[in-house]
């Protein structure tokens, strides 16, 4: 069984969760418990060290890895500045690069993301860049020092599933780096499909936070991710155009 190691840390639970869109900060602790997640993303603007009631960190256990994102950055320079602030505020060395200048579809800018990744990796950050799935950009992110890459399945927050499935599969097959499917996953079955493809992990936020029962939805995604990974490691049987009997069709009545 392959281990998922990022930044020298073994990640045993391959479901990453986000912290946005929940009805209250208090529910996040229960979602983390239900999902078993070791990694949670958060926007820096939700960290308020001067107001504990509004500070999201008060609801995140100390053993959970913080993955602050650079939400709001429209270019590499802004992403770099946000990452440095996050580390200075005590959020650690992990950073999810988000560089989005497209306000309609919220698609990440791969070129600016590569620039930010290079600078931050050189500064000792564990960089996980959010990207449009592309084999060439993936290779350049690896060269820039990314610890993993996070291609989108569909536009962020859309719950539309794996619309970029074939492009993600190419990245899984060709890149020697953890591929974490991020954005667009709307159902546990879609997370399972991503894991069956060989994704190293899935990051889910909107699908859990916008459900009527986020805690049970977190549990559902946990089971789906575990099942999909187990199926991938078990090496699924080949598909066939024709029927193939599982029991002998001859000999019994001869």
Curated annotation (Swiss-Prot):
Record EC number: 2.8.1.10
GO biological process: thiamine diphosphate biosynthetic process
Binding residue positions for 1-deoxy-D-xylulose 5-phosphate: 157, 183-184, 205-206
Any one GO CC term of the record: cytoplasm
Subcellular location: Cytoplasm
SS bond partners: none
Taxonomic superkingdom: Bacteria
Broad EC category: transferase
CDD domains registered for this protein in UniProt: ThiG
Pathway this chain belongs to: Cofactor biosynthesis; thiamine diphosphate biosynthesis
Recorded GO MF terms: thiazole synthase activity
PANTHER family hit by this protein: THIAZOLE SYNTHASE
Homology family: Belongs to the ThiG family.
Biological function: Catalyzes the rearrangement of 1-deoxy-D-xylulose 5-phosphate (DXP) to produce the thiazole phosphate moiety of thiamine. Sulfur is provided by the thiocarboxylate moiety of the carrier protein ThiS. In vitro, sulfur can be provided by H(2)S.
Self-association state and partner proteins as the record states: Homotetramer. Forms heterodimers with either ThiH or ThiS.
Protein name: Thiazole synthase
Organism this protein belongs to: Clostridium perfringens (strain 13 / Type A)
Gene encoding the protein: thiG
């Amino acid at each position: 069984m392959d281990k998922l190691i990022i930044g020298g840390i073994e990640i045993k639970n391959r479901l990453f969760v986000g912290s946005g869109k929940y009805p209250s900060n208090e529910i996040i602790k229960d979602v983390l418990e239900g999902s078993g997640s070791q990694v949670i993303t958060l926007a820096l603007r939700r960290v308020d060290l001067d107001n504990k009631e509004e500070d999201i960190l008060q609801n995140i256990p100390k053993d959970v890895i913080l993955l602050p994102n650079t939400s709001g950055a429209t270019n590499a320079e802004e992403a770099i500045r946000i990452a440095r602030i996050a580390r200075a505020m005590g959020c650690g060395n992990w950073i999810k690069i988000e560089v989005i200048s497209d306000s309609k579809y919220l698609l990440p800018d791969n070129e600016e993301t590569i620039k930010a990744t290079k600078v931050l990796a050189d500064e000792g950050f564990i960089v996980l860049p959010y990207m449009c799935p592309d084999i060439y950009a993936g290779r350049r992110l690896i060269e820039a020092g990314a610890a993993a890459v996070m291609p989108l399945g569909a536009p962020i927050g859309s719950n539309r599933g794996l619309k970029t499935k074939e492009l993600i599969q190419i990245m899984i097959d060709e890149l020697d780096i953890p591929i974490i499917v991020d954005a667009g996953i709307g159902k546990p079955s879609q997370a399972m499909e991503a894991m069956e493809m060989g994704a190293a992990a899935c990051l889910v936020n909107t699908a859990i936070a916008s459900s009527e029962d986020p805690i049970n939805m977190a549990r559902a995604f946990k089971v789906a991710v575990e099942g999909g990974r187990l199926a991938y490691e078990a090496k699924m049987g080949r598909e066939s155009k024709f029927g193939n009997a599982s029991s002998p069709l001859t000999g019994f009545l001869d």
